[in-house]
Amino acid sequence: MSFSAETKDELARIEEGKRCCNLAELAALVRMDGTLQIANHSYALNVITESAPVARKVYRLAKNLLGLPVDIMVRRKLRLKKNNSYMVKIYPRTLEDLQQLGLLDEEGEILPGIPNVLVKKKCDRIAYLRGAFLAGGSINNPEGTYHLEIITNDSLHAEALSKLLNKFHLGAKVSMRKSWHVVYIKESEHIVEFLGFIGAHRALLEFENVRVLKDMRNQVNRLVNCETANLNKTVDAAVRQVENIQRVANTIGLQALPEPLREIAELRLEYPDASLKELGEMLVPKVGKSGVNHRMRKIDELAEKLEEQSKRVRKGG
């Protein structure tokens, strides 16, 4: 089972709470996954899902909350690796039943977006978002890129969902994917907050564990890369120093150098892999890293002058 499916399975098993919250959650499930049929002054709501726990939740809420007749049917997929789909058929008795779910107004017209009456309180807003995620949401495995989304075919509903999420400061945005409107969250901290308040505590812990391990791996990689870069710089500098010392030795001889420069030059030739600090500790008296670096720069400057003189002589010859 994918991380997304496990998260939904956990959410679908949360026990029902207050009536207002249950109504908000059912309203989101019906609006996201349902279709309304009206014929001969009778109504039917068909809610289709591939998740058995979600289907059972819709069934329980519709039956226990509104006391409506409900049927549930399983459509078995014949193709391999295809999930079964479940259709929960709800039979609203009156227009008022549909109005309670925020689907129709008093005139029997379809209500756009999310009716305020459903999400007045914080607990209602949380319940509605949980229902919306159960119906049309998904979350990436935290081992990969961080991404949580809820998709809907209604632009007004997408904008309303985004605003509802951003009441909790979750940085939700809306984009288009073919004919679908995608409400998404990218920041890992915001995804963690969302999982927490909708009640996916087991998923939250797994997400956080993976995130911490990823951060540790990234930090170790950065340190290794930094140390490798520093080591490469040290090696390159040592190679350059040896080449310059040899140039001086072949041109004027190391004996022509002042004693402090000659001492460090001889040590560098003898210990080409040593760091500046290690070279300084070999001197008597000891010299700090900056002092050794200063002497090496003097030798580098002298080697460059000798190279320039050699070039001029070759040109003149």
From Swiss-Prot:
Keywords: Cell cycle, Cell division, DNA-binding. One of its GO terms (molecular function) is DNA binding. Residues 275-308 bind DNA. GO terms for biological process: cell division; regulation of sporulation. SUPFAM superfamilies: Homing endonucleases. Pfam families: HTH_WhiA, LAGLIDADG_WhiA, WhiA_N. It comes from the Bacteria. InterPro entries: Homing_endonucl, Sporu_reg_WhiA_N_dom, Sporulation_regulator_WhiA, Sporulation_regulator_WhiA_C, WhiA_LAGLIDADG_dom. NCBIfam families: DNA_bind_WhiA (TIGR00647). Involved in cell division and chromosome segregation. This is Probable cell division protein WhiA. It comes from Desulfitobacterium hafniense (strain Y51). The lineage of its organism: Bacteria, Bacillati, Bacillota, Clostridia, Eubacteriales.
